[in-house]
């Protein structure tokens, strides 16, 4: 019987030992002053016989305890049974107090778990709604790890070999990651939200107000980013409706310049509508305990109505929020540049590009999408979902479909860990393939969790049009994720550290051979997801993980296992996906050339960016970099110092220390009297108010300028 197994409370398997049962019975007997060695052994043997007779190969620990209780209750010493049950109850309580679940809950209540509190720079863990969400996340994560996910997937996650993203939401809940909302379909056809039947809007002000409500509802039903794709074109009909109202009123009142009057009013109404939308987004709290992580894609509209929306979005962002004109973190703005439309002087929308440059120099956003490169890399044009997740091309009935599609989730690989474990390159790729197998298994659990989900769990998504469909309450939602309509992504982190650990022969930027080695690793990952797509029919994609929290977590776990290793674990963070080491001093053009090879391989998610000094008075320099990027990368972001001190009036770059941010002029570090804005990964954060985790803070501190 030595091979008979016991399934412990954490799901692990141990060898059955009858002596442990006998010892527990002895303790219970001793507690009620009964000394009967034969009795204890006899009950132990009876328990063992029943286990071996009725169970094949293994038994759950709780089943064993139930059998022991039944045998004791039927014995000549029922008081021993009572003592055993009380003893077990006390042990259960003590065990519960020592459990990881209890420790994490206490860390939240006592505000002592810094890792949890600073995990997401968009969540203010000091306020009750966020704490409630974090508490739910702790429980959901615990349940998923113990009752839903396969044991080997959980172990790989716990060890830091992979990272199962957003475990605090899915797979406990049948939720997905990020999406492009079908705003056009919802507004044009109407929909129901809560108790209200929403009809098509009759003005741009109403359209933006409804858009804000849609964003809040959608963001509460998913755990990733919410993107409104081509918002300037989607909302342009409502600008026209408002304009026609103003024309009609002018005619009714015999206004001399009817068109001039209507144009003046619609410009004001459009500006106010998007100002309200920006304020709504930044004052809303979703049920996820955070401001909606929302992205607006715009810039391709050519009508005067679309141009007016583009101008309103950018002018409102330049103006800022509130009396101090603070830089808003959301919505993330993504402006599209296209040859013949707005790239060069003489293009009809070149003036909008100039406004976008001014805005980026003052507010960091907008990031830019280079139209031709987005099409080349992803197969069609669309904005990113959230900060960097991109969908591939997909058609229905001969028409390209983008809006209403989504990403089902991400599992990321710890590449530096594999390099640290490997003796040579051959060993690295052998282990990488093993980790790829477990990552695929983990990703398939995301698909499986959604297979029998009914539309009624998220009416806004599946019944009212956000996902581009109007299913009935009892219809399964899995059908809309198949055949490439939704993506599901393999992520990765730390190409820089992986190359250092594996080859230890200099900086990847300076060595052409090392560059090829880094590209080869990502190509290997890209080939793997293509195979998975053929095997399953689902649109697996390779995603360059933003790693806001992961840069810290993976490095921390690897330091614990391997120690401090120069060039790998010594910084306290891992470099974001394929990005150039943040400490490497190069110009923005060379940085673009270094990174441009990766997005075509990792077409499911990417961004490139540059670090700049204050360039508000040198927009030509920024435009030159934007233009250089056009034929090289699909997606580019501008990081520039825009911090403000409300004590002394300083504007520029605050000093970044391991403990926070300090005004270089007056030393002010009061978070209520400063505005500090930094790019976290693909999106911005306000680390003065909501601190980064230790690894991300260190990474931000080490960033050097590229111009």
UniProtKB/Swiss-Prot annotation:
- One annotated GO molecular function: ATP binding
Residues that coordinate or bind Zn(2+):
645, 648, 663, 666
InterPro entries named among the record's database cross-references = ATP-cone_dom, Form_AcTrfase_GR_CS, Gly_radical, NrdD
Positions where Glycine radical occurs in the chain: 682
Sorted alphabetically, the keyword list is: ATP-binding, Metal-binding, Nucleotide-binding, Organic radical, Oxidoreductase, Zinc
What this protein catalyses is: a ribonucleoside 5'-triphosphate + formate + H(+) = a 2'-deoxyribonucleoside 5'-triphosphate + CO2 + H2O
- Give the CC-aspect GO terms: anaerobic ribonucleoside-triphosphate reductase complex
The EC number(s) attached to this protein equal 1.1.98.6
Provide the activity regulation entry from the record.
Activated under anaerobic conditions by NrdG, a tightly associated activase. Activation involves the formation of a glycyl radical at Gly-682.
Q: Which residue range or ranges hold the Glycine radical domain?
A: 584-707
Where the record annotates domain ATP-cone, the positions are 4-95
- Top-level EC class as recorded in UniProt: oxidoreductase
Alphabetically, which GO biological process terms does the record hold? Answer: 2'-deoxyribonucleotide biosynthetic process; DNA replication
Against Gene3D superfamilies, the record matches this protein to: 3.20.70.20
The family annotation for this protein states: Belongs to the anaerobic ribonucleoside-triphosphate reductase family.
**Which NCBIfam families does the record cross-reference, listed alphabetically?**
NrdD, PRK09263.1
Q: How does it assemble?
A: Forms a tetramer composed of two NrdD and two NrdG subunits.
Q: What is the recorded function of this protein according to its Swiss-Prot or TrEMBL entry? A: Catalyzes the conversion of ribonucleotides into deoxyribonucleotides, which are required for DNA synthesis and repair.
The protein's name in its UniProt record: Anaerobic ribonucleoside-triphosphate reductase
Gene name, Swiss-Prot/TrEMBL: nrdD
């Amino acid at each position: 019987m030595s091979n008979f197994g016991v399934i412990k409370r954490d799901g692990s398997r141990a060898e059955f030992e009858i002596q442990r049962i006998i010892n527990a019975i002895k303790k219970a007997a001793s507690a009620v002053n009964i000394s009967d060695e034969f009795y204890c052994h006899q009950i132990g043997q009876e328990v063992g016989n029943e286990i071996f007779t009725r169970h094949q190969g293994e038994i759950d620990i709780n089943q064993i305890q139930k059998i022991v209780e039944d045998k004791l209750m039927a014995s000549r010493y029922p008081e021993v049974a009572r003592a055993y049950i009380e003893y077990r109850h006390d042990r259960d309580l003590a065990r519960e107090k020592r459990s990881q679940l209890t420790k994490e809950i206490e860390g939240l209540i006592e505000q002592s778990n810094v890792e949890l509190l600073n995990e997401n720079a968009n969540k203010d863990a000091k306020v009750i709604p966020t704490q409630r969400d974090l508490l739910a996340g702790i429980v959901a994560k615990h349940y998923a790890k113990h009752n839903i996910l396969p044991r080997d997937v959980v172990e790989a996650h716990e060890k830091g070999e992979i990272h199962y993203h957003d475990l605090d939401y899915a797979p406990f809940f049948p939720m997905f990651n990020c999406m492009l909302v079908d705003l056009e379909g919802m507004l044009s056809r109407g929909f129901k939200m809560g108790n209200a039947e929403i009809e098509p809007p009759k003005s741009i002000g109403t359209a933006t107000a409804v858009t804000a409500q849609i964003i809040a509802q959608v963001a509460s039903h998913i755990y990733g980013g919410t993107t409104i794709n081509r918002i300037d074109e989607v909302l342009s009909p409502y600008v026209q409706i408002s304009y026609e109202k103003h024309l009609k009123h002018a005619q009714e009142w015999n206004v001399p310049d009817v068109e001039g009057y209507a144009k003046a009013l619609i410009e004001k109404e459009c500006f106010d509508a998007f100002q309200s939308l920006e304020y709504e987004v930044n004052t809303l709290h979703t049920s996820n305990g955070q401001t909606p992580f929302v992205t607006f894609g715009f810039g391709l509209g050519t009508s005067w109505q679309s141009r007016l929306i583009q101008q309103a979005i950018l002018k409102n962002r330049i103006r800022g929020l509130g009396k101090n004109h603070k830089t808003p973190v959301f919505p993330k703005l993504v402006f599209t540049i296209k040859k013949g439309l707005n790239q060069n002087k003489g293009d009809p929308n070149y003036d909008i590009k100039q406004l976008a440059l001014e805005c980026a120099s003052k507010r960091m956003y907008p990031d830019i999408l280079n139209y031709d490169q987005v099409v080349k890399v992803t197969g069609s044009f669309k904005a990113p979902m959230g900060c960097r997740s991109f969908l591939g091309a997909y058609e229905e009935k001969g028409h390209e479909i983008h809006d209403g599609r989504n990403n089902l989730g991400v599992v990321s690989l710890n590449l530096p860990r594999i390099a640290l474990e490997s003796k040579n390159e051959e060993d690295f790729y052998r282990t990488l393939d093993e980790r790829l197998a477990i990552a695929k298994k983990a990703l398939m659990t995301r698909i499986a969790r959604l297979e029998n989900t009914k539309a009624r769990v998220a009416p806004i998504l599946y019944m009212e049009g956000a996902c581009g469909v109007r299913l009935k309450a009892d219809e399964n939602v899995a059908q809309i994720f198949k055949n490439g309509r939704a993506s599901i992504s393999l992520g990765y982190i730390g190409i820089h550290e992986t190359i250092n650990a594996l080859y230890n022969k200099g900086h990847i930027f300076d060595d052409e051979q090392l560059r090829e080695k880094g590209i080869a690793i990502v190509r290997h990952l890209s080939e793997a997801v293509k195979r998975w797509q053929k095997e399953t029919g689902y649109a697996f994609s390779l995603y360059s993980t933003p790693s806001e929290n992961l840069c810290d977590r993976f490095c921390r776990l690897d330091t614990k296992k391997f120690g401090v290793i120069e060039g790998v674990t010594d910084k306290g963070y891992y470099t974001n996906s394929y990005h150039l080491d943040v400490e490497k001093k190069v110009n923005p053009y060379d940085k673009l050339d270094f990174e441009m090879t990766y997005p075509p391989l990792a077409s499911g998610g990417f961004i490139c960016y540059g670090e700049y000094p204050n360039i508000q008075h040198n927009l030509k320099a920024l435009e030159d970099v934007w233009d250089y990027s056009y034929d090289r990368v699909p997606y580019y972001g501008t990081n520039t110092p825009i911090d403000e001190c409300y004590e002394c009036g300083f504007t520029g770059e605050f000093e970044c220390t391991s403990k926070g941010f300090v005004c270089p002029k007056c030393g002010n570090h009061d978070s209520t009297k400063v505005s500090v804005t930094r790019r976290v990964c693909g999106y911005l954060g306000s680390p003065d108010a909501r601190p980064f985790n230790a690894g991300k803070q260190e990474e931000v501190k080490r960033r050097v300028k590229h111009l």
